[in-house]
A protein has these predicted regions:
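Short, well-structured N-terminal submotif of metal-dependent ribonuclease cores
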Residues: 1-29, 40-52
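Residues that scaffold the ATP/ADP-binding catalytic core of kinase and kinase-like folds
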Residues: 2-4, 36, 117
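Short active-site oxyanion
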Residues: 20-23, 64-66, 102-106
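Acidic catalytic patch
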Residues: 27, 53-84, 92-93
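Short glycine/serine- and small hydrophobic-enriched flexible loop segments
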Residues: 35-42, 103
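Acidic, PIN/NYN-like endoribonuclease modules and their adjacent C-terminal/linker elements
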Residues: 95-129
Length: 129
């Protein structure tokens, strides 16, 4: 969302997006992103016209992502990660997705619990903290 709505971390996310590596995300980023945009609209952070533009930009960005789907093994791994690290279900799916992509994958998150779990699982995190 930090590419669509300017907030803390938007500059770093833009730099990472423009880096010469493929951007990937778990498939849950789509409903989470749409929910965040709708919440921003309801909360008055986006006008009706800004909301429409943000949705269009979000859809465009989605088309550029490598999306990691959820299958039974990934769901089970997410369950294990949730239990081991005390994560919420969707955060565990995001971490399992990053781990499934393998070495060299950096998980980008501002959620401290998810960042801690990623680091403990051997997954690099951004922003550095």
């Amino acid at each position: 969302m930090k590419l669509v709505i300017v907030e803390v971390g938007s500059e770093l996310v833009a730099e990472l997006w423009d880096a010469p590596v493929e951007a990937a995300a778990g498939i849950l980023c789509y409903p989470e992103g749409r929910a965040a945009l709708a919440a921003a609209r309801r909360g008055g952070r986006l006008s009706s016209s800004a909301y429409g533009r943000a949705c269009e930009e979000f859809e465009s960005l989605q088309s550029e992502l490598l999306l990691v789907g959820i299958d039974q093994p990934l769901a089970r791994e997410a369950g294990e990660l949730a239990e081991r690290h005390g994560l919420r279900g969707y955060d565990a799916v995001h971490l399992a997705s990053a781990l499934a992509l393998g070495a060299g994958t950096t998980l980008v998150s501002w959620d401290e619990d998810l960042r801690r779990a990623a680091a403990q699982s051997g997954c690099p995190v951004a922003p550095p903290g």
